[in-house]
Swiss-Prot record:
Organism classification: Bacteria, Pseudomonadati, Pseudomonadota, Betaproteobacteria, Burkholderiales
Disordered: region residues: 36-68
Gene this protein is translated from: yidC
Membrane topology designation: Multi-pass membrane protein
Reported function: Required for the insertion and/or proper folding and/or complex formation of integral membrane proteins into the membrane. Involved in integration of membrane proteins that insert both dependently and independently of the Sec translocase complex, as well as at least some lipoproteins. Aids folding of multispanning membrane proteins.
Protein origin, superkingdom: Bacteria
Record keyword Cell inner membrane present: yes
Native species: Bordetella petrii (strain ATCC BAA-461 / DSM 12804 / CCUG 43448)
Recorded GO MF terms: membrane insertase activity
Pfam family, one: 60KD_IMP
Protein name as catalogued: Membrane protein insertase YidC
GO cellular component: plasma membrane
Family: Belongs to the OXA1/ALB3/YidC family. Type 1 subfamily.
Amino acid sequence: MDIRRTILWMIFSFSLLLLWNNWQIHNGKPSLFGTPPASSAASPAEGQQAAANGQAATPSVPTTPAAAAASTVPGATAAPAAAKVEQVVVSTDVLRLTFDTTGAQLIRAELLKYPTSGQPNKPTVLLDRSPELTYVVQSGLVGAPNGQSFPNHQTPFRLVSTDHELKGDSLQVVFEADSGGLKVTKTYTLHRGRYDIDVQHSLANTSDAPLAPSLYLQLERDGNDPADTSSFYHTFTGVAVYSEQDKFQKITFSDIAKGKGSYIKQADNGWLAVVQHYFATAWVPPQGKQRTNELLQVQPNLYAARSIEAVGTVQPGATAQVDSRLWVGPQDQKAMAAVAPGLELVVDYGWLTIIAKPLFSLLTWLHSLLGNWGWAIVALTVIIKAVFFPLAAASYRSMARMKQVAPRLQALKEKYGDDRQKLNQAMMEMYRTEKINPLGGCLPMVVQIPVFIALYWVLLASVEMRGAPWILWVHDLSVRDPYFILPAVMMATMFLQIKLNPTPPDPIQAKVMMIMPLVFGGMMFFFPAGLVLYWCVNNTLSIAQQWTITRNLQRKAEAAANR
């Protein structure tokens, strides 16, 4: 009865199942566990093609909530004639943004400090409006009376500001538009070294009657996975909604298309975001004001996440102002937490967040000391192994004793043959005599599993690993080892671990144990180098611990035999 090997066999079988499932998804076939969260094989939608031609991608603006219905406006001015469409490029030290004067919407964002994977001189493009990607930031006003319309993301705006490059600590990009008796001034304020943008909507009632507009803040994206998405490990691409009541809620694009997404519809706090591996875009509306959240499919493979809130009644000649914040950039947990409560949760460590967050904090602290994320991973692995050393020692002692009695165990199997009842009784008697716990090598491993899984997600999800070098040939811990040296080292360490363990008496189990390094090592060929580095260090330390403990037990046994 070897429960430890049974558990290892279960882990091995499940890993093969996951590997096959990812291969199915990679080849465009249905997932074994249901519909994939986002279809990377979807054909370009009509909305994407329209956007590439300079047209508005969304066929209509949001409807007005019932509470914000407007009254008749006898003196409202007609919408101005269409202005020339213009694209405005502005830049800071960390962002290069492109605005379209149609709707004063943000249609392209380049992250200057984050190169594209494999192209160090090309910045990552997070937002874009092209045949390959539709991902834009929009806002506007609804609730105009008598079939008129307030300025929205389809309305021609005029560029008012003149500066296109950050020279001081902040840069303002200002647009204006008049429609439906409402003059709207939209101001984007960018800051040095920051990815959060202050967005101000100033409303002036130029009509002869009160107006009651509602402001919508909208993110629009196609449902395709990012171009650099791996088929060998899953990362989330979709929408996230946060509120103090329901906390963090993730919704896949496929669930939005089916109308199945579960999220808070009415709230007076929180934010909404579109999330992908390492990066996010989020609207943070004014806190303390009631709003409606909407997630919808506006066209095939084109989705919108928006928040709509009533501005209140604006009297003739009066003005109103709504201040919001926009995040466009990496999933920097510290910076995001300073922008809005819970915004750092877009870095989703899953059900092991309670363990993962302290691990990330410790990893960040080690990086501040060592100045290198690769060495920080090595140091963190050493610390974790040291903390779990008592458990590991108990496990290795149990395995060493099992190895010592392996010949006797084989003799019992030959003696009792197919009589399983007598064999089990004899094995239990031998375990009692030798003071061996059959579960002794298994339970310590089980206790450590949640910590190692949490660390796996920390290394996979943390944007700090992206573009971070280690030594020599490893120039980016977030991509696979270009020369496959680390996966080869990992396979070698796994073979050594197997050699140190008792040989399974069952020939089939023995063959499976020898195949496991090839399977897991083969998977690691496609995993980020930071993860493989962690496994290599972990395995190396495990081998050193096991060899030391086994040698000590052998010496004690030899000393006892020589007395």
